[in-house]
UniProtKB/Swiss-Prot annotation:
Binding partners and assembly: Interacts with CALM, EP300, HDAC3, KPNB1, ZNF208 isoform KRAB-O, SLC9A3R2 and WT1. The interaction with EP300 modulates its DNA-binding activity. The interaction with KPNB1 is sensitive to dissociation by Ran in the GTP-bound form. Interacts with PARP1; leading to impair its DNA-binding activity.
Region feature Sufficient for interaction with EP300, mapped onto this chain: 52-84
Pfam families reported for this sequence: HMG_box (PF00505)
Stretch list, region Required for nuclear localization: 6-22, 75-81
Similarity-based family: Belongs to the SRY family.
Name by which UniProt lists this protein: Sex-determining region Y protein
Localization terms from the record: Nucleus speckle; Cytoplasm; Nucleus
Source organism of this protein record: Rattus norvegicus
Residue ranges of the region described as Necessary for interaction with SLC9A3R2 and nuclear accumulation of SLC9A3R2: 94-138
Post-translational modification: Acetylation of Lys-81 contributes to its nuclear localization and enhances its interaction with KPNB1. Deacetylated by HDAC3.
Gene that this polypeptide is encoded by: Sry
List of residues that carry N6-acetyllysine: 81
Expression (tissue specificity): Expressed in the substantia nigra (at protein level).
Residue segments, region Disordered: 144-169
Length: 169
């Protein structure tokens, strides 16, 4: 971006610039996000005395920046809003997301069946609320047919609870 003036580095950025390079060389397969996490932990573990030279350097850079760009004002770029999708497409996407969320996992969560997927997913996206699944206690080694039957009973129980809640509102 031409004409863009970067902000001066803060103390952490001054310190992490060299540390990031070292960490990346020592761990070539480490992802940048992991390196950032490690740097954050390391920075927090430093004492004030260990951090002081980096704060001083950051202050020096800030002063130089102010002299070089006297009219500089930090103006973060705002994200451009993406236009809303059509209702039908929102339902399809929400339904697919919900279906993926509701697949069996190691915690054995209850599953909403059939047409309730699309309705629940659409309601979730419409109300901007998350759908919370309740864990189900099923003993290890439980036969698959009984697991499914147990799930259906849990689903019926969940529906009854929801109907009772709607009656009170």
């Amino acid at each position: 971006m031409e004409g863009h003036v970067k902000r001066p580095m803060n103390a952490f950025m001054v310190w992490s610039r060299g540390e990031r390079r070292k960490l990346a060389q020592q761990n070539p397969s480490m992802q940048n996000s992991e390196i950032s996490k490690h740097l954050g932990y390391q920075w927090k573990s430093l004492t004030e005395a260990e951090k002081r030279p980096f704060f001083q350097e950051a202050q020096r850079l800030k002063t130089l920046h102010r002299e070089k760009y006297p009219n500089y004002k930090y103006q973060p770029h705002r994200r451009v809003k993406v236009p809303q999708r059509s209702y039908t497409l929102q339902r399809e996407v929400a339904s697919t997301k919900l279906y993926n969320l509701l697949q069996w996992d190691n915690n054995l969560h209850t599953i909403i069946y059939g047409q309730d997927w699309a309705r629940a997913a659409h309601q979730s996206s419409k109300n901007q609320k998350s759908i919370y699944l309740q864990p189900v206690d099923i003993p290890t080694g439980y036969p698959l047919q009984q697991k499914q039957q147990h799930q259906q009973q849990q689903h019926v129980h969940l529906q009854q609870q929801q109907q009772q809640q709607h009656q009170f509102h």
